[in-house]
């Protein structure tokens, strides 16, 4: 279980404050207007930002000040952060060992994830030789191979065409279900959110303004639907 209790980040002296509970294996979409604090929320969970106050626990362990490298979380951005001079295999391998000295079990795990992502025939290529969708598959594989209990997505597929984006969302959702991972995904699209998340959280003005069923948001019946430009 992921639990945030009054986690506070001071942005230009204006506090953003979040309280949220997400169960193990749950898939949750984080929606809201631009600048509302969605990415800030993910960065606080990942440890890239240190809160001024509040408590963040994962499976009842306090991780409020745990550095990102030691936090049981993986995060995928729109910018995939692949190393251009490393092969696909090496980029994925970094998720297992920063020194890329993989034992037989780790090699097997890496190739299994690559097969699951449909990139096992690309392992010797460099990122510059891949399409945008292929690069995101590699970045996702690097996240999944770490087998952390929580996966955070900050609009990683927004630059892809609609068909490819839907394919990647399905791949993420299925992979998280198989590994029993908790998924939190920032998105500007309620339609994308509805594909993988039955529950949504709406962020506005640095607060969680609403949380509930994604279908209710999409129908326009939720109090926060108007914040997303959805009319009932």
UniProtKB/Swiss-Prot annotation:
Residues 2-230 form the ABC transporter domain. It is found in: Cell inner membrane. Gene3D superfamilies: P-loop containing nucleotide triphosphate hydrolases. Its main location: membrane. Disulfide bonds: none annotated. Keywords: ATP-binding, Cell inner membrane, Cell membrane, Membrane, Nucleotide-binding, Translocase, Transport. It is a peripheral membrane protein. PROSITE patterns: ABC_TRANSPORTER_1, ABC_TRANSPORTER_2, THIQ. The complex is composed of two ATP-binding proteins (ThiQ), two transmembrane proteins (ThiP) and a solute-binding protein (ThiB). Belongs to the ABC transporter superfamily. Thiamine importer (TC 3.A.1.19.1) family. Part of the ABC transporter complex ThiBPQ involved in thiamine import. Responsible for energy coupling to the transport system. This is Thiamine import ATP-binding protein ThiQ. It comes from Escherichia coli O6:H1 (strain CFT073 / ATCC 700928 / UPEC).
């Amino acid at each position: 279980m992921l639990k945030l209790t009054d986690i506070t980040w001071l942005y230009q002296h204006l506090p953003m404050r979040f309280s949220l509970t997400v169960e193990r294996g749950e898939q949750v979409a984080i929606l809201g207007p631009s600048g509302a604090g969605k990415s800030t929320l993910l960065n606080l969970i990942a440890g890239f930002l240190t809160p001024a106050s509040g408590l963040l626990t994962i499976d009842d362990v306090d991780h409020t000040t745990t550095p990102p490298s030691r936090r049981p979380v993986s995060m995928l951005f729109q910018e995939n952060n692949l190393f251009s001079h490393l092969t696909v295999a090496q980029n994925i391998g970094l998720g297992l060992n920063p020194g890329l000295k993989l034992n037989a079990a780790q090699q097997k795990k890496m190739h299994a994830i690559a097969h699951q992502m449909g990139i096992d025939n690309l392992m010797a290529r460099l990122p510059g030789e891949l399409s945008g969708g292929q690069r995101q598959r590699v970045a996702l594989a690097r996240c999944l191979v770490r087998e952390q209990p929580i996966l955070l997505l900050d609009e990683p597929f927004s630059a892809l065409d609609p068909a490819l984006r839907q394919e990647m969302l399905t791949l993420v959702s299925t992979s998280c279900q198989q590994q029993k991972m908790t998924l939190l995904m920032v998105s500007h699209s309620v339609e994308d959110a509805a594909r993988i998340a039955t529950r949504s959280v709406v962020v506005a003005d640095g607060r969680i303004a609403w949380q509930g069923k994604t279908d209710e948001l999409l129908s326009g019946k939720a109090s926060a639907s108007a914040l997303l430009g959805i009319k009932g």
